[in-house]
């Protein structure tokens, strides 16, 4: 039994859709699956719109948060907000409850285009965030790597252009946008095995997925290695630090652990969100096509759409200043995201240790604390290098000490049997009794005065 899909009936809208024959060979998905997907997408869409909307509002209204690095957070929130609004609730939710796509071919292409642009934009924005954090933490003393509003704006423009280039191809015939999975949402056509579609899928896989993931892995791996190496160096220098420097070092160690954890969470979240989708697309092109069932195709869609919820939590709510603004403007949001009091105090201590002028570069308190700690370590290392080496270079001089003269000592020296046995002779008799004899006074000095 094929899937019950209306195509030639007369409705107040045109339900006719171009559906790939691959999907028609499967039995109809149970109604409970459609309703479950509709509820899930509605929840993701509402939370994604509210969460990312709050991020955009607070970052644009709070002057202290309008830093170059936070421009990437705003762009990511805008991308996820649009992704949740268009590709989640209400279009896909309505289609799931109707059990088929109800908006026609033109809307399918627009839906797929918007999902492609803002989905790829989220990936590329996360890549730019990883590059910025690598420059701040992994190479903090490089003046040329300092982020500015102009540089951040140029990088964001590049993200928009890059995402649009790869997403707009199917509109002009390089691939296509079509229904997928349970036929309630549209995306790239990864089922058709012709040269055009295959080249489109491969190029997107390499340049829009693998390249960003390699950059993200490289940046966060080097961040973890950098903070680990500096922690070891700081432990070796701990004995030479005063109380203030030691307090900064301890705060930096806390920042290291937090940054390492966040790095692992970011990479894991990225892989869970987008890797299943990439695997299904490659499997459909180069693997057994029968493995790409409606369920196998729809599950990665759910992971990808849920990423719009994860991103504001990871990139924004972990920001201490952002949490303060949430607590003052939207305290009800934090009721579901309680934080350990010690963690909040550590964040405040980290910020208190850093002068206000040093936080204007856009980095978070953790990144700024790490930057100051590494600057202090590099200063100490430079002082060590300025001290003269001991012993000085070139000492002792070459050829010193001089070699002994040739033929010295003479052959056969000392003579055999020398010194003679029993020489020198041991003293005879018991040791002398009484105190040791006293030295005579110098000439012209009274003996009694000398003894006194």
Curated annotation (Swiss-Prot):
Residues 346-365, 376-452 are annotated as: Disordered. GO terms for cellular component: cell projection; membrane; plasma membrane. Contains one covalently linked retinal chromophore. Upon light absorption, the covalently bound 11-cis-retinal is converted to all-trans-retinal. After hydrolysis of the Schiff base and release of the covalently bound all-trans-retinal, active rhodopsin is regenerated by binding of a fresh molecule of 11-cis-retinal. Keywords: Cell membrane, Cell projection, Chromophore, Disulfide bond, G-protein coupled receptor, Glycoprotein, Lipoprotein, Membrane, Palmitate, Phosphoprotein, Photoreceptor protein, Receptor, Retinal protein, Sensory transduction, Transducer, Transmembrane, Transmembrane helix, Vision. One of its GO terms (biological process) is phototransduction. A motif ('Ionic lock' involved in activated form stabilization) lies at residues 132-134. InterPro entries: GPCR_opsins (IPR050125), GPCR_Rhodpsn (IPR000276), GPCR_Rhodpsn_7TM (IPR017452), Opsin (IPR001760), Retinal_BS (IPR027430), XYPPX (IPR006031). A lipid is attached at residues 336-337 (S-palmitoyl cysteine). GO terms for molecular function: G protein-coupled receptor activity; photoreceptor activity; retinal binding. It holds the Pfam family XYPPX. It is found in: Cell projection, Rhabdomere membrane. Residues 59-70, 132-151, 225-261, 316-452 are cytoplasmic. Residues 389-440 have a biased composition (Pro residues). Glycans are attached at residue 8. Photoreceptor required for image-forming vision at low light intensity. Light-induced isomerization of 11-cis to all-trans retinal triggers a conformational change that activates signaling via G-proteins. Signaling mediates the activation of phospholipase C. Subsequent receptor phosphorylation mediates displacement of the bound G-protein alpha subunit by arrestin and terminates signaling. This is Rhodopsin. It comes from Loligo forbesii (Veined squid). The gene is RHO.
